């Protein structure tokens, strides 16, 4: 997630889809034991209590089957990916191995930087693009790789709302797709204007 390490990857939501009140969060925290009563060292993977599923490989294979990665590789574009020390790093290394990777190492505290791909958190990436001078495009993802930020070759930031608008435009104009556009509550209302 783009949340700080102290969240430990968890986000608790209420019945209305928003965050829980601090009082409810405290009630939940109060029932969590200080120590783990289960000895995880004695649970064997062969015991059938745990099923190992390689979701990363499933995702990589899905992307390879649905995107023309060969065209991207042959395009000659100089691409950069900033994982912000998050979970997207391994999958993208398998999907686009010739991309230049930064912040692609495991660090549970994200080196103290909030792993949210917004301009103020991506100053290092912006400076890298400007200093290199030959970067065509740079992508950054948050801790769990479900939020993105984009830079053009001039080091200009493009936020996720504008990325969505660009994708809708591309799919309608160049791929000739028609139909409904589904968005999340947090998506820019300009998508509706564009889709109408």
What is each PLM-predicted segment?
Residues 82, 102, 140-142, 151-153, ...:
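Generic beta-strand/beta-sheet core signal
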Residues 26, 30-60, 154-196:
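Proline/glycine-rich low-complexity loops and linkers
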